[in-house]
Each structure stands twice: as structure tokens, then as C-alpha cells.
Amino acid sequence: GLLDALSGILGL
């Protein structure tokens, strides 16, 4: 989802 994309970029 959205968090998956953000987390993927931030490395979280």
C-alpha cells in the first residue's frame, strides 16, 4: 500500500 512505498524509500 501507500506505507509500503514510503517505507521502501525511507528504509523503514
From Swiss-Prot:
Report the record's Gene Ontology biological process terms. Answer: defense response to bacterium; innate immune response
Cellular compartment(s): Secreted
Q: Which domain of life is it from?
A: Eukaryota
Q: TM segments? A: none
A GO cellular-component term linked to this record? extracellular region
Q: Which residues form the signal peptide?
A: none
Which family, according to the similarity comment? Belongs to the frog skin active peptide (FSAP) family. Frenatin subfamily.
Q: What is this protein called?
A: Frenatin-1
- According to its UniProt entry, this protein's organism is Nyctimystes infrafrenatus (White-lipped tree frog)
